[in-house]
Amino acid sequence: MTRVDVDAVFKALADPTRRRLLDSLRANSGQTLGELCRNLDMTRQAVSQHLGRLGDANLVATIRRGREKLHYLNPVPIHEIYERWIAKYQRRHLVALHALKRKVEGGRRGKA
């Protein structure tokens, strides 16, 4: 994933409406624009613009079925971000937090 791709994903995820769209697609992938509008109580134009940003970030894929355009969540960019920025640091931080928790809780027991 290039820096431009990563920046596009983070910019897309920064907007709460786009995160709600992704949540809606995660719960029920393959929705039409109309279905997404009903779930979010937004105009078609607003939802369409947000879907465009999500598509630019490769977070949403579309497939035409007849006259309908179905929108699907593409979790790959989010997984790549997880692998790059979260997974490799996760274990070390969890071990440190667990040690801190034991130390703090041990200190509380001694003072009680």
Spans of features found by a protein language model:
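Amphipathic alpha-helical dimerization/coiled-coil segments
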Residues: 1-5, 26-27, 79-112
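Conserved H-loop
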Residues: 46
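Short amphipathic alpha-helical/adjacent loop interface patches that line ligand
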Residues: 40, 51, 75, 90, ...
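Alpha-helical residues within the helix-turn-helix
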Residues: 38, 49, 55-56
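N-terminal helix-turn-helix DNA-binding core of bacterial DNA-binding proteins
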Residues: 4-43, 68-80, 84
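Beta-hairpin "wing" of winged helix-turn-helix
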Residues: 55-66, 72
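A cross-family signal for key residues in well-ordered alpha-helices
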Residues: 11, 23, 55, 61, ...
